[in-house]
Design a protein with these regions (language model features):
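Positively charged n-region of N-terminal signal peptides that target proteins for export
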Residues: 1-5
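General helical structural elements
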Residues: 7-8, 228
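Bacterial N-terminal signal peptides
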Residues: 8-16
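Short, intrinsically disordered, charge-balanced linker/junction segments flanking boundaries
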Residues: 17, 21, 271-273
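Active-site-adjacent loops and short helices of periplasmic peptidoglycan-processing enzymes
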Residues: 19-170, 177-181
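Domain-terminus/edge residues, biased toward the C-terminal soluble/receptor-binding domains
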Residues: 149-153, 161-273
């Protein structure tokens, strides 16, 4: 019996070693997957609980994309901006800079979320779809459970700091896979490098995509950055080179530069494994 246990433990340890051979990513937690085969090529404490920060916005977008796909929502639908949504644009958070009373299309709100990482746009979209952000968060968590994201709960649509808004890099990976598989047309928006909001009563505002990998020559085409002081820097990313797609998620990078460097290292490593 002891011999069997020893063999099982040895096999498990050898599997972990083979997955993580030859590279150590400087993040608290990370995971890398081959999109087509589903094979995990690297993992580092992938089930550790994290605050997903703006990676939360992937699910916010998914809820809208699902509704568009089912015919219950249109890109041309317009939502009136509430004071709650507007206040986030003046509170120092990443914003689309929408104004109270503006009527903004679903398409513009989604682009403001995906490219400009607008927290104000998240609330506007959430309220437009579900009535309140709290009700929208329930939809997000329900979708997460449907996808098998077992260690995730969403408390808001933007990822601002809340102890009840938590996930893991493994769960973020599951969510990213769903986005790319089920909504390839809209996933292309995540590769856009800038978005111009032609706001009411003011000059147009152009903002760049915050994903640093889009500006490197590695074939990156998404997905979403994140930052919270309690979590440090995070990134869900994907590259598509020579017909092979890889998805990586990391959290707990100490700096912006290390997030960019280590995520790039991880994805490049995956191309040779």
């Amino acid at each position: 019996m002891l011999k069997k246990i020893f063999i099982i433990i040895s096999l498990y340890l050898s599997l972990i070693f083979s997955v993580n051979a030859n590279i150590d990513i400087k993040a608290r937690t990370a995971i890398l997957q081959d999109f087509l085969s589903g094979e995990i090529l690297y993992e580092k404490d992938p089930d550790r609980s994290i605050y997903p920060a703006s990676m939360t916005k992937i699910m916010t977008s998914i809820i809208a994309f699902d509704l568009i796909k089912s015919g219950d929502l249109s890109l041309d639908d317009k939502f009136i901006i509430s004071e709650k949504a507007w206040r986030l644009s003046t509170a120092g958070y990443s914003s689309m800079f929408i104004m109270v009373g503006d009527e903004v299309s679903v398409e513009d709100l989604l682009l403001g979320i995906i490219i400009a990482s607008g927290n104000d746009a998240c609330i506007a979209l959430a309220e437009g779809i579900a009535g309140t952000e709290e009700e929208f968060a329930i939809l997000m968590t329900s979708k997460a459970k449907e996808l098998g994201m077992e260690n995730t709960n969403f408390a808001n649509s933007s990822g601002i700091n809340d102890p009840d808004n938590y996930s893991t890099v493994r769960d973020i990976l599951i969510m990213s896979n769903y986005l790319i598989k089920e909504h390839p047309k809209y996933y292309e928006w995540f590769a856009e490098k800038e978005f111009t909001w032609n706001r009411t009563g003011g000059d147009p505002i152009t903002q760049g995509n915050r994903n640093p990998l889009l500006y490197k020559n590695i074939g990156a085409d998404g997905i979403k950055t994140g930052y919270l002081a309690v979590e440090k820097y995070s990134l869900a990313s994907s590259i598509n080179r020579k017909g092979r797609r890889l998805i990586a998620v990391g959290s707990g990078f100490e700096t912006k530069s290390s997030r960019s460097r280590e995520s790039s290292r991880l994805l490049t490593y995956g191309l040779t494994n």
